[in-house]
UniProtKB/Swiss-Prot annotation:
Any GO MF annotation of the entry: ATP binding
Protein name, UniProt field: Putative cellulose biosynthesis protein BcsQ
One of the record's GO cellular component terms: cytoplasmic side of plasma membrane
Record-stated family: Belongs to the BcsQ family.
InterPro entries reported in the protein's UniProt record: Cellulose_synthase_operon_BcsQ, P-loop_NTPase, ParA/MinD_ATPase
Residues annotated as binding ATP: 1-8
Induction: Part of the yhjR-bcsQABZC operon.
Transmembrane segments: none
Pfam family, one: CBP_BcsQ
Species, as recorded: Escherichia coli (strain K12)
Keywords: ATP-binding, Nucleotide-binding
General remark: Cellulose production is abolished in E.coli K12 /MG1655 and W3110 due to a premature stop codon in this gene. The sequence given here starts on a GTG codon 6 nucleotides downstream of the premature stop codon.
Functional note: A C-terminal pseudogene fragment of BcsQ, which has a premature stop codon at position 6 of the intact protein. The mutation prevents cellulose synthesis, and has polar effects on transcription of downstream gene bcsA and probably also bcsB, bcsZ and bcsC. When the reading frame is restored cellulose biosynthesis is also restored, see (AC P0DP92) for an intact protein. May play a role in subcellular localization of an active cellulose biosynthesis apparatus at the bacterial cell pole.
NCBIfam families named in the record: cellulose_yhjQ, PRK10037.1
Length: 242
């Protein structure tokens, strides 16, 4: 929906919760910011990733990292300053990742492939989104997201997940009540504001690993169970659309 709503943190947290429920999970960073790795204790100086490998003519599969016996991570990789400023020069060279992920899906090695997608409208983002059997649009309950819900198209069939909900905020409560009446794809659970969500990135861990007793961690676990009940009839992957 927009940057800063917590998509990357929730992607990491959902991946952790699904593997805690016994699922085999691959979490893929499709954002050039390359931040997802920092939620899985990867060194800041680690430059490798699937996109970096493709741009350097290397095998993208070698960029995968093991976090737990049931959770693997595929970072994006670090771009140079010039690459960051000129994405049109390299984005078209990344399309092979789509066939690679399709092969992984068909292999059955992972029951869930979570893709942290950027909010841009690039070709590679659209290609990756088209691979996803399901998508979650992460929103904050504020006027900004309310406006965007009416002027930005969501992916077909996307569900809307509220993050950073503040108890006691009158404007949030008003907007939330409006959404309950108007947003038919709103998920039946939400993620409340929790300091643990801010702390976990500093600790370089998913929130459920950092503080399993935190309210947000319990709510993400509820989300994971909901995904199992509603998305996993054929063990299909979930994508997160920002």
């Amino acid at each position: 929906m927009r940057g800063g709503v917590g998509t990357t943190t929730i992607t990491a947290a959902l991946a952790w919760s699904l593997q805690m429920l016994g699922e085999n999970v691959l979490v893929v960073d499709a954002c050039p910011d390359n931040l997802l790795r920092l939620s899985f204790n990867v060194d800041f100086t680690h430059r490798q990733g699937w996109a970096r490998a493709m741009l350097d003519g290397q095998d993208w599969r070698d960029a995968g990292l093991r976090y737990t016996s049931q959770l693997d991570l595929l970072p994006f990789g670090q771009l140079s300053i010039e690459e960051q400023e000129n994405p049109q020069h390299w984005q078209t060279r990344l399309s092979d990742i789509c066939s690679g992920l399709q092969q992984l899906k068909a292999s059955g090695r992972y029951q869930w492939i979570l893709i942290d997608l950027p909010r841009d409208a690039s070709q590679i983002t659209h290609q990756l989104l088209s691979l996803c059997d399901h998508s979650l649009a992460i929103v904050n309950v504020d006027a900004n997201c309310h406006i965007r819900l009416h002027q930005q198209a969501l992916p077909d069939g996307a569900h809307i997940l509220i993050n950073d909900f503040r108890i006691g905020s009158q404007v949030q409560d008003d907007i939330y009540q409006l959404w309950l009446q108007s947003q038919r794809r709103l998920l039946p659970m939400l993620i409340h504001r929790d300091e643990a969500m801010a702390e976990c990135l500093a600790a370089k861990q998913p929130v459920g690993e950092y503080r399993s007793d935190a309210l947000a961690a319990e709510e993400i676990l509820t989300l994971a169970n909901w995904c199992l009940l509603n998305y996993s009839g054929l063990k299909t992957p979930v994508g997160s659309a920002s």
